[in-house]
Amino acid sequence: MAGSNILHKIKLKAGFCGSAPDMGRGKSKMWKNITHGFHCVKGKSSHPMEDYVVSEFKKLEGHELGLFAIFDGHLGHDVAKYLQTNLFDNILKEKDFWTDTENAIRNAYRSTDAVILQQSLKLGKGGSTAVTGILIDGKKLVVANVGDSRAVMSKNGVAHQLSVDHEPSKEKKEIESRGGFVSNIPGDVPRVDGQLAVARAFGDKSLKLHLSSEPDITHQTIDDHTEFILFASDGIWKVLSNQEAVDAIKSIKDPHAAAKHLIEEAISRKSKDDISCIVVKFH
């Protein structure tokens, strides 16, 4: 196999979003009705693309797992890249993954962040948001997140947010209790210590005393009313509501085409950020 073809397959599996538009699609081997696709586009900023994506199915101990994630880096891409490579592996290595999935996710988020902080000389001073989804045997979905990348489910055409936006204004008391402050400058969004626009993130060693990496976690059962789930970085959510996003893609059957269309819609609404989107279809 030619080197370029090998690289292409690696990129489709891992979901690296480079400076040019990147894309991928796939489907469950156990559940033929479940398909997934992703699309990524670099924003208007001068720095390199800082989004990394995971979108794949894998078999483990007789089960099939759908692994989906958006990692939206800031002040560099190294932390987001590290998460793409390591976070799911760390979750799946937890001894209680099958018996207490939520606890396994919390432990892995915590331990992964600890390693990132220990390796700050290598990984840099930046950080990353994360939204992760683990689909177990096509029936059970566990979503975890830190930051403002978001997961949204469409059921009977109605949008249901599965993640929590960790905004500094909402967590002001917690930030202040740790010795930090939330700036509120006219014309700007609230920021932790006047710097970061999210209250929870991986990395960010210089702010870590005032930041949390504790995820919010939700559990969902996939049923006949579940149409699709979308995971996306905040470049979507700055310009589209949850319901607008669902309405924009509900009639598009191919998940990659749906992800691409949603990003194009966000760009048409003047979104300037890096944008990554995963769509998982159940029909």
From Swiss-Prot:
Domain of life assignment: Eukaryota
GO molecular function: metal ion binding; protein serine/threonine phosphatase activity
Required cofactor(s): Mg(2+); Mn(2+)
Binding annotation for Mn(2+) 1: 72-73
Positions with a binding annotation for Mn(2+) 2: 72, 234, 273
Annotated EC: 3.1.3.16
Cysteine disulfide links: none
Keyword Lipid metabolism set for record: no
Family: Belongs to the PP2C family.
Listed name of the protein: Probable protein phosphatase 2C 58
Organism ancestry: Eukaryota, Viridiplantae, Streptophyta, Embryophyta, Tracheophyta
